Design a protein with these regions (language model features):
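Conserved catalytic core of nucleic-acid polymerases
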Residues: 209, 260-264, 318-319, 324, ...
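Conserved "right-hand" nucleotidyltransferase catalytic core of DNA-directed polymerases
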Residues: 1-27, 32-43, 49, 124-125, ...
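Active-site-proximal helix-loop-helix substrate-binding element of RNase H-like nuclease domains
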Residues: 32, 39-43, 49-67, 72-187, ...
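C-terminal structured "cap/appendage" subdomains that terminate the fold
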Residues: 518-567
Length: 607
């Protein structure tokens, strides 16, 4: 069965809204800063049949988009953030209306594990590319080998022969032809939601072009050349079980250690011990003697620093694809085959964030956003009241009778309540509560029951959400992001969907409004944002961004969601210069920088 089966018979109605519908594709290579250098553009209006085919010299002389761009016109482009970045490189305005078949195809299949990943590639990650999308809908597609060959030709050359130029332009046209065919198979049940997603892709293009400013000299000239020596230093210091041979981890030594200690250990489907970093981290909570190994592998020893270095250009910015709509809840998942997103790496590395001359770098984050979304969407008056009072973890402790009103915050009780606050929205089990709290199963059962009795309206609402989703065979975010519900969909996925997909709605709305208002977003990070501002406009920019974030939260949750400034870094400082000494990763940042700069490292000899 094709992914498009069951499409509405009114799927073409949205086309009546536009006088022209231009399908557009650009081909480009990248410069040293990972920014696009547009090579050519092909476009076709499906209404009039007009076509355009422009080479780079023609594009460089353009001062306006070469196709219609009014309120009654639309641009259709697959993974449109690439085309929109090309327009930024050319100094051209953005189209008024953007429709992206990449995103709309995800909406069509999101959660339907029967069609994606393909049956013969069930371990495949990511979203369907153009050729995959065509195949999903039972449409003919070119070979992947042809696409790879053309892509390599474009990326690996700076000048093209006349024959190559003709071949590239034909390939450019083929991409447009395929997009038109795919668009005809897709059902768009809400053009307003689709245009919202297109506006977010425009925001993605702007954010990907900015990137995160870093201390390039430190990362490129000091950290990278000394990386193996840094790894060796920490391995020699912290590898108390002698599991490494130089900088290489010897799996058999850990197997032998597990058996010698008699540790209970999870196995792979083939019966081998699981040795992933996350597995060792979880096991370290059971066997504390493993904590130093877990920390060593997570923070230094197994970190492939080259994937971070690959994102940093000569201009001192780290740029990594944001991969919008990559998760089932519509969130980004920034990465690439040879790149890693700096905020996804251990916190100590973020000490190298550094604004450019005359600028400040600011991190703004929401306060208990997921709690607020669930409180607002469920209409639970007690949850809403507790959110309005401040610290939701402590307010829950008071309401649940675990702390007296007016009592000073007890960190131990607050941390226990934090487990319930964070876990209950996705259906954390008593076993999960007991494991995290290091308490008995009876205590965990009582605490879970107390949570639901404390917020009964939310409890009933979450149950109704799950029931309705299973009946409808789908669930949607406040702004229309859809997840197909099948027999395989987990109940905790449905319980958590509103908080996570609602959070994605908030992030997308903030990104759209802020970038369209001229605020420079360096990167969205889950629920937080790193923004850049001139030093003399810092206070007004923070105030404006906070206002946008608060209002976006209100539009999604129904109640204002508070915003806090997490960090302010003013040039010429880096984040590591201003973070508090007890901030996560700060001690490690200072230690590594001191090692590198004071020559306390041993050279690594590779055999």
């Amino acid at each position: 069965m094709s992914a498009g089966s069951g499409a509405s018979t009114t799927k073409d109605d949205w086309r009546q809204r536009f006088q022209s519908i231009w399908h557009v594709d650009t081909e480009y290579r990248e410069d040293a800063n990972h920014l696009p250098i547009p090579i050519c553009l092909h476009a076709r209006d499906e209404v009039s049949g007009r076509t355009l085919s422009l080479w780079r010299d023609e594009l460089l002389t353009s001062t306006r988009l070469p196709f219609d761009n009014g309120p009654d016109d639309a641009m259709v482009a697959f993974a449109s953030n690439a085309e929109l970045q090309s327009f930024l490189s050319l100094g051209l305005p953005f189209p008024t209306n953007v429709l992206d078949p990449y995103v709309e195809n995800i909406v069509a299949i999101n959660g339907n594990t029967a069609v994606w990943p393909p049956a013969d590639e069930k371990k495949r990650k990511g979203r369907p590319g153009l050729l995959d999308a065509l195949k999903l809908h039972g449409l003919p597609a070119r070979s992947q080998e042809h696409k790879d060959r053309m892509r390599d030709m474009i990326l690996e050359n700076e000048d093209y022969t006349p024959e190559q130029r003709l071949e590239i332009q034909e390939y450019n046209k083929e991409d447009v032809d395929d997009t038109i065919v795919l668009g005809g198979a897709l059902s768009i049940d809400s053009i307003d939601h689709a245009l919202f997603r297109g506006r977010y892709m425009a925001a993605v293009a702007r954010m990907e072009r900015v990137g995160l400013p870093v201390d390039g000299e430190f990362f490129l000239d000091e950290l990278a050349p000394n990386w193996d020596a840094i790894r060796l230093h920490y391995i020699q210091r912290d590898d108390e079980f002698h599991l490494y041979d130089g900088v290489n981890f010897v799996e058999e030594r850990l197997w032998n250690l597990i058996e010698a200690k008699g540790w209970d250990w999870p196995l792979t489907p083939t019966g081998r011990y699981q040795l992933k970093i996350a597995t060792i981290g979880r096991q370290a909570t059971r066997y504390p003697e493993l904590k130093s190994l877990a920390r060593l592998r997570d923070q230094i020893a197994e970190l492939r620093i080259n994937k971070l270095i690959n994102t940093i250009g000569p201009d001192g910015f780290s740029r990594c694809p944001l991969l919008p709509y990559w998760t089932i809840t519509g969130r980004n998942q920034p990465s690439a085959k040879d790149k890693m997103f700096l905020p996804s790496l251990p916190k100590w590395l973020q000490g190298g964030l550094k604004p450019p001359l005359g600028m400040a770098l600011v991190e703004l984050d929401y306060v208990a956003e997921e709690f607020a979304i669930v409180a607002g969407r469920s209409g639970d008056p007690d949850m809403i009241a507790d959110y309005g009072k401040g610290d939701v973890h402590w307010q829950y402790a008071i309401r649940a009778g675990l702390a007296a009103p007016g009592a000073a915050v007890d960190d131990h009780i607050r941390d226990l309540c934090k487990i319930l606050v964070h876990g209950s929205n996705y259906g954390i089990t008593p076993y999960g509560i007991a494991a995290r709290a290091k308490k008995s199963l009876d205590w965990a059962r009582e605490m879970r029951a107390r949570w639901w009795s404390t917020y009964p309206v939310c409890h009933q609402w979450l149950g109704d959400v799950v029931t309705q989703a299973r009946f409808d065979e789908e669930i949607r975010s406040p702004f229309g992001w859809r997840l197909i519900v099948t027999a395989d969909t987990k109940t905790r996925t449905l319980m958590n969907f509103t908080a996570q997909a609602g959070g994605a709605d908030v992030m997308q709305l903030v990104s759209i409004v802020a970038t369209e208002c001229g605020i420079t977003i360096a990167a969205p990070v889950h629920d937080a944002f790193w923004i850049l501002a001139p030093l003399d406009e810092l206070d007004t920019t923070i105030a404006r961004m906070s206002e946008i974030m608060t209002e976006a939260g209100r539009l999604v949750a129904g109640i204002p969601i508070r915003v806090k400034v997490e960090a302010v870094v003013r040039w010429p400082q880096c984040l590591g210069d201003v973070r508090k000494p007890d901030a996560k990763g700060q001690a490690m940042w200072c230690e590594v920088r001191e090692l590198v700069r004071n020559g306390g490292l041993q050279k690594v000899v590779h055999g």
